[in-house]
Amino acid sequence: MAYKMLQVVLCSTLLIGALGAPFLLEDPANQFLRLKRHVNLQDYWDPDHSSDVWVNTLAKQARETWIALKTTAQYYLDMNTFTFDMSTAQ
């Protein structure tokens, strides 16, 4: 009886260890992504960072969106740049 109990305990321990082993090892790609996210988040949440960064980021994103829209329209409509000049649109 004790021998059978020892076998059951040993088999269950090995089974749990075998099923849990892949989760204990960290994949190098996942480790790289985790470290990369950590580095990026440090830049965003730096308390010494200026609060104007978000405004500059939004302004830059709006400018890049406008340039992409202008470039796409020029490509598909084959119009000159004066028509899509940002200074005349304002």
Curated annotation (Swiss-Prot):
Q: What residue stretch is flagged as signal peptide?
A: 1-20
Query: Which keywords label this protein?
Result: Signal
| Protein name listed in UniProt | Uncharacterized protein C3orf85
The organism encoding this protein is Homo sapiens (Human)
